[in-house]
């Protein structure tokens, strides 16, 4: 089963050394991978490539997703703040 993620989705890592950490999907890659970032450990300039099988979607950050889709600049501080203040976590 292939999971369909969108830009701005809030995900929890279920496998690996980053298990139970919360991230946002910042880019969709081919072959069942997405690039995730949290603005701190994995900044937007160096997102982590993660297999979608190892992620669980728990919500969506609309403002971040809209900015990423339109190509507008998103800052690490903005992403980190959005993840912290969302009522998802």
Residues covered by each model-derived region:
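Ferredoxin-like alpha/beta domains used as RNA- or RNAP-binding modules
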Residues: 1-7, 14, 24-89
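Short, charged beta-turn/beta-strand-edge "cap" motif at the junction between a beta-strand
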Residues: 16-19
């Amino acid at each position: 089963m292939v999971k369909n993620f969108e830009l701005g989705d809030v995900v929890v890592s279920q496998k690996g050394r980053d298990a139970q950490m919360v991230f946002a999907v910042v880019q969709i890659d081919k072959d069942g991978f997405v690039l995730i970032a949290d603005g701190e450990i994995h900044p937007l300039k160096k997102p982590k490539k993660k297999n979608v099988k190892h992620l669980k979607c728990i919500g969506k950050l609309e403002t971040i997703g809209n900015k990423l889709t339109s190509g507008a600049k998103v800052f690490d501080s903005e992403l980190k703040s959005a993840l912290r203040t969302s009522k998802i976590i």
